[in-house]
């Protein structure tokens, strides 16, 4: 069953799965600081269990972005006129490193 989830969107860096993995190998503390300072939240659909800190590739306009799960969305976060898109694939959990 699909659920709505709130995610933190990495707008500038990392911009791809490859860039995320490279940065987590070389400068993981910087990625965690970017995550902690990030307040750009969007809502997506998810089929998986909602686990805070799970990192996914997500559609973002005509591109994709790296996002980290924050929490399950409240009903007040969901607008019926918006067509929410599902997260593409899980790649990591930023809080378990």
Identify the role of each PLM range.
Residues 2-21, 29-97:
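Terminal, basic amphipathic appendages of nucleotide-handling enzymes
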Residues 25:
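Extended active-site and interfacial segments that coordinate phosphate-rich ligands
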């Amino acid at each position: 069953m699909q659920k709505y989830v709130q995610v933190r969107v990495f707008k500038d860096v990392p911009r791809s799965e490859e860039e995320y993995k490279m940065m987590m190998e070389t400068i993981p503390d910087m990625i965690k600081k970017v995550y902690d300072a990030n307040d750009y939240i969007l809502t997506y659909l998810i089929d998986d269990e909602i686990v805070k800190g799970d990192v996914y590739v997500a559609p973002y306009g005509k591109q994709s972005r790296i996002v980290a799960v924050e929490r399950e969305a409240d009903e007040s976060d969901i607008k019926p006129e918006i067509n929410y898109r599902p997260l593409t694939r899980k790649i990591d959990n930023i809080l378990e490193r």
